[in-house]
Design a protein with these regions (language model features):
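Perimembrane helix-loop-helix junctions
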Residues: 100, 105-106, 133-167, 179
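Specific aromatic-rich, kink-prone transmembrane helix
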Residues: 49, 89-106, 118-120, 333
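Membrane-interface alpha helices of multi-pass inner-membrane proteins
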Residues: 112-128, 133-134, 165
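Transmembrane-helix signature of polytopic, membrane-embedded enzymes
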Residues: 26-29, 45-73, 92
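Short acidic/glycine- and proline-prone juxtamembrane loop motifs at membrane-interface regions
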Residues: 76-90
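Transmembrane-helix motifs of polytopic, lipid-linked glycan transferases
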Residues: 33-58, 96, 270-274
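Membrane-interface transmembrane helices that cradle and orient dolichyl/undecaprenyl
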Residues: 56-61, 97-113, 123, 145-147
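Membrane-lumen/periplasm interface segments of specific transmembrane helices
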Residues: 157-269
Length: 383
């Protein structure tokens, strides 16, 4: 009963794969190692569907390839490739669901809404945090309803189809455990080790303590990074350990990588503000529903991550692996913002404005290339 709070899908798949591997190799150790190939499959599939999603946004070519680099060279995905846990398939299923939702939005084919509902349902059956996509999904349906005056009956029918498939898949396990074992809907037992405790830190320290901003690494469980935002930025790149221990030459590129990541996070927030302004002034943008989708998803996931870190004040609660679903909306927001600036620059503008627009749109491909090179170097040389 202690582990009934876990959604079962990943563990069922991994369990049968483990039994199959044990029978084939006659070695439980080899079978356990073989589960890493399952994680690699999840990461590869997530990357392919993320590329499909970026293609659906009809980005300029150089912005599209910049998005590919930012997503596929995100170190969290490197860590996930050999990581046997439910976080990896949760990311995969959520990305698959987003892709088919976008295809449904463009084509209005019920087959795509069936696939999206299955992807979402399997995602929640893997990890409950996939439910954080619900507000973004609702925003997409609302955009579709508001722009389809003559087809609203069909849209409502597709919405009902989505609910009929997704809800039983998503909540069946939770309802079963509540009926049989009186389990709460969202129950996380306190399993964190003593050395990770942040519960005596004030709210101000959890948000505004930037005393550790100069250090790119966290070394759990002795970490002192009470700041939720910094901890997530660091663990996105390097996990919960100091990679420079035993390899001092990795510190300089890691520090540069860390500073670049902070800058990209700032650009993401600025990009949200810019896209909101553009959405309010330009009523004809074809990407507006997807802009709203990613902004709502990004804000929801960050809000959830903050609440989770405050409710469970431990180092592990700010580990980026728990919120890796942020990788896609962050990448998409940066790409949508750069594409918007590039397209506005194609119109007639003054000389200084044109120069600024050119610099802004060239920044993302250059930053993405540097991001990919640093990420690859650190994880090839640093490990």
């Amino acid at each position: 009963m202690y582990y009934l709070f876990h959604q079962p899908l990943h563990f069922i798949v991994a369990g049968y794969l483990y039994l199959t591997g044990s029978a084939l190799w006659e070695s439980t150790a080899a079978a356990a190692e073989g589960l890493q190939y399952l994680s690699l499959f999840y990461v590869t599939t997530a990357s392919v569907f993320a590329a499909f999603i970026l293609r659906e946004l009809r980005l300029p070519q150089k912005i599209f390839y910049a998005g590919i680099l930012l997503f596929m060279f995100n170190p969290t995905l490197f860590l996930f490739s050999g990581y046997i846990s439910d976080d990896t398939p949760a990311v995969m299923w959520s990305i698959i669901a987003v892709y088919f939702l976008f295809r449904w939005y463009k084509t209005e084919k019920s087959l795509y809404i069936l696939a999206a509902a299955a992807g979402f349902g399997f995602g929640v059956l893997t990890k409950l945090s996939v439910l954080m996509a619900v507000p973004a999904i609702i925003s997409l349906f609302l955009c579709k309803i508001s722009t389809s005056e003559g087809k609203r009956t069909d849209i409502f029918a597709d919405l009902c189809l989505f609910v009929i498939i997704a809800v039983p898949l998503s909540l069946g396990w939770v309802i079963r455990n509540h009926i049989l074992y009186d389990m709460q809907f969202y129950n996380i037992p306190d399993t964190s080790p003593w050395g990770q405790n942040f519960k005596y830190q004030t709210l101000g320290e959890r948000i505004f303590d930037f005393s550790q901003i100069s250090k790119p690494f966290i070394n759990a469980p002795t970490a002192v990074d009470a700041n939720i935002w910094l901890a997530m930025i660091k663990t996105e790149l390097f996990g919960e350990w100091d990679m420079s221990i035993g390899n001092v030459f990795i510190y300089v590129p890691a520090k540069l990588f860390y500073l670049l990541n902070i800058f990209l996070k700032i650009c993401t927030v600025a990009g949200i503000l810019y896209l909101l302004h553009q959405a309010a002034t330009d009523k004809s943008s074809r990407n507006k529903p997807f802009v709203w989708f990613f902004i709502v998803l990004y804000i929801t996931l960050w809000g959830y991550s903050f609440k989770y870190a405050m409710d469970y004040p431990y180092v592990c609660s700010t580990d980026y692996r728990l919120f890796a679903q942020l990788i896609l909306p962050e990448t998409a927001i940066l790409c949508l913002c750069a594409a918007r600036i590039l397209r506005s620059g194609c119109r007639k503008s003054s000389f200084p404005t044109h120069i600024w627009q050119k610099a802004a749109t060239n920044f993302l491909p250059v930053a993405a290339l540097l991001y990919a090179l640093l990420s690859a170097f650190i994880y090839v040389y640093g490990l």
